[in-house]
Amino acid sequence: MKSSPNQLSIFSYLLGICSLDTLLSPVGRKMDAISPLVILRMDNHISSFFSEFQPNGQAPISSTDKQVTPQVSHDGQVLEFAPPRRLKTEEIPNIVDDFRIAARNAIEAGFDGVEIHGANGYLIDQFMKDSVNDRTDAYGGGIENRCRFAAEVITAVAGEIGAHRLGVRLSPFADYMDCHDSDPEVLALRVIGLMNNLGVLYCHMIEPRMCVGAGEDGSKPVIAHGRLLPFRKAFRGTFMVNGGYDRDEGDKAVADGYADLVAYGRLFLANPDLPERFRRKAGLNKYDRSTFYTSDPVVGYTDYPFLDDQNSELATR
């Protein structure tokens, strides 16, 4: 199952995924990335609340059967969500195995690592957070039970590909798709404890306050460092932060020891050579939010210019 149309899957399409890895790996090396590492983000492939994206129009699965509250998109469109189907207890091991198989396929395709997406209202988040999880079986109730699915997925993937190839993304403070928790600090520390025991390579955590990116409306993002510091101190591996950072804020986070790495999303989407632009302190392309999550293979994805292309164009004018 998919959470959006035209979403890339890695259950059987290994030849296409191999081609993607072959294409992307030299780019990482050319831009002097931290390592020639191409991370396959393991999005929750079965969390969609849009039944039209599911095989034969079947209901999307979840920890619950509660329907997501209608939401207004950035363009003013009201999104109605299909009622999900609550997973039966006996079905859950098969879902855990889906994550394991996808991770194995990623490594066989040539990727160096896998990131499990346990954030932003996807399936793992739906199990962990008490605003959604209303189960009465071994996967619901107290925090240990609510984290059981996450623990099983992380353990299975680590056992399949090695914890040294594995990262986990968490958003304890976020409220996506009605997913929020009454005690996010305790929840995140619980998962981090599991990750420490397994020796997971990195923890990728989203800031509690998603800031407006620089260049979107002329404002400069201001990030109140500190909310993620307890998790940074608790996690024994590499700690990565994300959420509205620009170059200066990212440098500060690393220099202050607040994080080991800073992840960029929207800025990277609009600037395919973002590391080089940061290195030169060059200007950035402005991203176009209206093209986010579209199915067009070019517009909004591969049509943003490289810095050298822009300089060459200016030189010929």
Curated annotation (Swiss-Prot):
UniProt KW keywords: Fatty acid biosynthesis, Fatty acid metabolism, Flavoprotein, FMN, Lipid biosynthesis, Lipid metabolism, NADP, Oxidoreductase, Oxylipin biosynthesis
Enzyme Commission numbers on file: 1.3.1.-
Active site per database record: 122 (proton donor)
Keyword Lipid metabolism part of the UniProt annotation: yes
Gene3D superfamilies to which the protein is assigned, alphabetical: Aldolase class I
Purpose: Putative oxophytodienoate reductase that may be involved in the biosynthesis or metabolism of oxylipin signaling molecules.
Name of this protein: Putative 12-oxophytodienoate reductase 10
The species this protein was found in: Oryza sativa subsp. japonica
Lineage, top ranks: Eukaryota, Viridiplantae, Streptophyta, Embryophyta, Tracheophyta
